[in-house]
């Protein structure tokens, strides 16, 4: 009965192939992401403070 068992492929086989593929996407460093978020937060605070006087 033990001879009828089928073996499964290793679980990491698909992961290695996934990370080896190159995609055509915009690549942003972690520092760039943090900078973009900080700029958006500053813009939001600016609009919150001065938006009513600027836009009526």
Curated annotation (Swiss-Prot):
The keyword Nucleotide-binding does not apply. Keywords: Cell membrane, Membrane, Protein transport, Translocation, Transmembrane, Transmembrane helix, Transport. Residues 52-56 are extracellular. It is a single-pass membrane protein. One of its GO terms (biological process) is protein transport. Its main location: membrane. GO terms for cellular component: plasma membrane. It comes from the Archaea. Residues 1-29 are cytoplasmic. Component of the protein translocase complex. Heterotrimer consisting of alpha (SecY), beta (SecG) and gamma (SecE) subunits. Can form oligomers of the heterotrimer. This is Preprotein translocase subunit SecG.
